[in-house]
Amino acid sequence: MTKPKIFIDADACPVKAEAEQIITRHQLDLVIVSNGGIRPSLNPLVQLIIVAEGPDVADKYIADTAKAGDIVVTGDIPLAAKVISNKVTAIRHNGDIFTTDNIGGQLATRDLMADLRAADPFLVQSNRRGGTTAFSEKDRSRFRNSLEAAIQRIKRGN
């Protein structure tokens, strides 16, 4: 039985508590990676890693540390692309699973939206930015189900 380690890209992550509940039930290690502002957990299974401030420092730590069979929780598409290429499971906060089949399209969409924002300075300043909808209880439930399923799959060796 493989024992995965769970990594959370913690800055702006709304499901840290849910992940901690699940890892406690399974007696797995949880590594929360942040550049600060996160309260340490009293749970001995939870390790808080504070990295230097700067763009993508937490992402680099996670990408360099997570191994095949581990799970990464992130909303960062480039980080997800890096880790899934190393056979790490990547789960979005809302429970969506990043896969080798869907990551290319997500990276392309992300890059296109960045180009559109850069080309329209008024878009950045207006309410037309788009963005995501509010994080819901349904999203939390989907995340819990996805993390639970990923842990079970890895433990079975699939």
Question: What are these model-predicted stretches?
Answer:
Residues T2-N158:
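Nuclease catalytic cores that cleave nucleic-acid phosphodiester bonds
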